[in-house]
C-alpha cells in the first residue's frame, strides 16, 4: 500500500529540507480527493510518501498545531500517487526517512491520534481511473474540546437512570478490593506516555475533564477493583517492589469497598482514567482448565471463551429444575437464598455447589441431584444486560463472592460505623490528618538534611 499525506495549515509557512516532490497548503482537511487532471496541472501540489517534513525551522507552538490528512490507497498502475511515490523513493534512498515515517505513524496509532474522517475504504473514480483509498486525520498537537458536542461524546452511563440505580442497590452488599494510600486515594496505573506528556496535553486533559468530554490524546490510566483479596495483595506487593520508600511513606494498603461503588466508577469515564474489574485469577484458571468440560456447566450464548481464555469475571447462576411427580404433575423448582427469593449470582463455583448442597437438604426429593445445572456468564456483561431493561422487567438479585473476600472484609473493618460521626471521621478526617502528618514528616526531613 502507498501512504501519502497532505499537510493542512491556516497560513503559508516556509518549509525547508522537506521530502515532497511538489508542494502546496490546502485550506481545509476536507479537500480529500482532487481531480487527477487538476492535480497534474497544479504546480504547487504537495504529495508525501514514506517520509515526514523537516519542520525544525518552525516554532514549536506552530508545529504542534499541525494536523495531517493521511490517504491510504492500494497499489495500482492507475493510482494517482504511484508515480510521485516511486520518484520520491528513488530520490531519497536514505532508509532513515522511511523508518522515521512509519515510526511516527505507529506511535500515533498507539496514542489514538489517528481517526477516520471518511466512509469506510472504497473505490474512487478519478478521471475514469478507479482506485481504493481511505482518508484519516492525524492530530499532532493540542486538541481543544468541542463544546457543541459534549452531549454526543459523553460516554458515561447515566447513574441516575432507573435501571442503574436499581443495579447499585443490588450490588451494595458485595465486597471488592482496591489498593489505596493514606489519603484514601486509589493507586492508579499510568502508561509511560502519560507520565512524559507535555504541558499542552495536560491542559487538554484538564479541559476535557471540566466539560466531561473524553479525548484520546494518550492511553488512559487504570484504577483496579479486585474480586479476590489475594490478587489485590499481589498488586500491592508489586507496587511496593517498584517504589518501596514511597509506599512506606504513603501508607499503601488494600481496602474493601462495595461492589456498587466499583460499578459506579467503572461506568463513568474521564478523559484519561478508567476503572476496571480484575477477575478472580484462580477462579478463571480453574474454570478454564478444570471445570470447562463439566456436564452441569452451560455457557451463556453471548459468553466469549475458549480452551485457554475466558472473558470477564465468571459468574454462576443455578438454573430451575423441572420435576415430574408420580401423579403426572410437573413442578418447576427455582433456587433461592435462605431468607428471600432473590436471584443468586455466584462469582465462585465452590460457593455455588455448597449453596446447592444446603438447598437440597431443605428439599428432600432433590437429593439425587448432587450437582446443580449452572449457567456460566461474566459479571460485566450480566450488568450491561440489566442496564437496558425496563423497570417492570428488573428482578432483584444478589452477588455472592468468594469466602476469602468476606473474611478479609470482616478483618479489615476495624472501626465499626455505629453512627454517622464514626463514618465521617474514618472517611474524611483521618485522610486529612494523614496528609498533615505526612508533610510535617517531610518538612522535618528537609530541615534536618545535611
UniProtKB/Swiss-Prot annotation:
InterPro entries tied to this protein: Tic22-like
Keywords: Chloroplast, Plastid
Chief site of localization: plastid
GO biological process, any: protein transport
Cellular component, GO annotation: chloroplast
Localisation per UniProt entry: Plastid, Chloroplast
A Pfam family annotated for this UniProt entry: Tic22
Family, similarity comment: Belongs to the ycf80 family.
Stated name of the protein: Uncharacterized protein ycf80
Species name: Porphyra purpurea (Red seaweed)
